[in-house]
């Protein structure tokens, strides 16, 4: 990484495939639409200080491989990884197994409260 330029950060945001349609027809929308909004907030914030490499929320094995290929092609300096909610571990395990060596910053956001009333 050149210290005079912005870092190139790969964003690995993991979601739960089984929840994608959950919440359909509710005022807050589906799980997927809510997680897309959350992802957008993280991308905007990171975009203030880094060049972001992102190819969407990772839900399944094919998403993991596509994301790894993109991160490798773009030569990311590091990866920011985060579960957007509970999700199966297989995507994370495949990422750790198959991603070439790169610094990984794992984040776990703890919310003060959950506003879930209707899913």
Per-segment meaning from a language model:
Residues 2-119:
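Metallocofactor- and cofactor-centric catalytic cores in central/energy metabolism, strongly enriched
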């Amino acid at each position: 990484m050149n210290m005079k330029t912005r870092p190139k950060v790969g964003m690995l945001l993991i979601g739960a495939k089984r929840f994608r349609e959950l919440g359909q027809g509710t005022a807050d929308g589906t799980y997927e639409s809510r997680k897309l909004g959350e992802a957008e907030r993280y991308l905007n914030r990171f975009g203030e200080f880094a060049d972001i490499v992102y190819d969407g929320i990772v839900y399944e094995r094919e998403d993991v491989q596509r994301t790894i290929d993109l991160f490798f092609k773009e030569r990311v300096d590091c990866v920011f990884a985060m579960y957007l909610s509970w999700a199966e571990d297989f995507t994370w395990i495949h990422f750790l197994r198959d991603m070439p060596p790169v610094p990984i910053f794992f984040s776990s956001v703890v919310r003060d409260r959950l506003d879930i009333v209707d899913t």
